[in-house]
Amino acid sequence: MEKNIQDFIDLIKKKNSNEPEFIQAVTEVAETVIPFIEKNKQYQSDKLLERMAEPERVTMFRVPWTDDSGQVQVNRGYRIQMNSAIGPYKGGLRFHPSVNLSILKFLAFEQVFKNSLTTLPMGGGKGGADFDPKGKSDREVMRFCQSFMVELQRVIGADTDVPAGDIGVGGREIGYLFGYYKKLRNEFTGILTGKGRSYGGSLIRPEATGYGNVYFAQNMLKTRDQKIKGKTVVISGSGNVAQYAAEKILQLGGKVVTMSDSGGYIHDADGIDEAKLEFIMDLKNNKRGRISEYVEQYPSATYHAGERPWSVKCDIALPCATQNELNGDEAKTLVSNGCICVSEGANMPSTPDAVEHFVDSKILFAPGKASNAGGVATSGLEMSQNSMRYSWTSEEVDNKLHSIMNDIHEACVTYGTQEDGFVDYVKGANIAGFVKVADAMLAQGIV
């Protein structure tokens, strides 16, 4: 079995030699799914996992735009259409200088499993550009988004591929993208999710990834007769996911003591309460400032430049920033400091060494493909509402989100429970996500 796993990983490395993030994501899945395939004959034909690791389509394109000084700038755009076995491609757009083929393929591959776990009919995809919205004027962002959509509109559609936001793509960018699609195609359809409420967006969509992550952590804690109430929580990031994860933690009686951005992290031992969180939301969403400004408003807090928050003592850790932000040494520090639960809000924020240590330590650890699936689940609910030309209330959407996260947790427990009763959520999420897609691929033939 070990040889089969290694042979598969070697094949992936050979075909994708300059794509470390993609290789990392596929390796993590292969280590748990290949042993499952070996025990289940129906999945041994047709090279299912190998086909899942090969995108159905990759589109790469030039994005020229003009800045405010009249200079022409050129960026590179992408759309990875990974797998459509269970529904139209679904996955976010990321605008960040680090964006490349490896990162987007890893995100698209993860998205296939994540979307499968939601039980909604959505395939997996991802896209973006190496454009940095930071420091750009609204008009510059608009011109970039319009140029980006000129090419993207060729490959998306309400029943083909429905993108959403991700890092660097929030409500402003989605609005510009949607507006230009409408102008180019002369049609008002649900080709993007994360839209504003006034033009087809869903209530709870902005909150969904953060809320869903906390709901998943809540479910894990219940398996050990624990609650969020009274727990100290360390959160990384200060964007959409981190903000609403913090909001839900506060609603459930937890104490949030850190948030961060690419410059460093703030530690507020007194706790980030509702008023302080409101300040952070305004700072990040409206003023587009840096988290370091928090300590100017609240001097009792400390700012740690160039550092990550994992040395801060806590009961629960929610990594909500970006991939590979939590390494093996930091995982050891968290566990030795008494952390009992880690629930990933970002995509693959823990390195393989960190994941291995969490699982070996038998703490509660949720991989992002399960714990942050609330965002895409609510995107799926937005697609449903767009199709019906109807809107559900906040309570209805939140109840559906809560139910979906409960179902994902249940699926992880079903496939991840070990002989000693310990739940390996990594194994559970990978196998549960694989089974639905594999069944659909087997039914549809070699395509």
Describe these PLM feature segments.
Residues 20-23, 41-46, 119, 156-165, ...:
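Flexible, glycine/charged-enriched surface loops at secondary-structure junctions
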Residues 42-73:
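Structured beta-strand/loop patches that form or line metal/cofactor-binding pockets in enzymes
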Residues 96, 115-229:
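Glycine/serine-rich phosphate-binding loop and adjoining beta1-alpha1 elements at the start
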Residues 264-365, 370:
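Rossmann-like adenosine-cofactor binding region
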Residues 193-196, 201-313:
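Glycine-rich phosphate/diphosphate-binding loop of Rossmann-like nucleotide-binding domains
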Residues 61-122, 126, 130:
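Phosphate-interaction motifs
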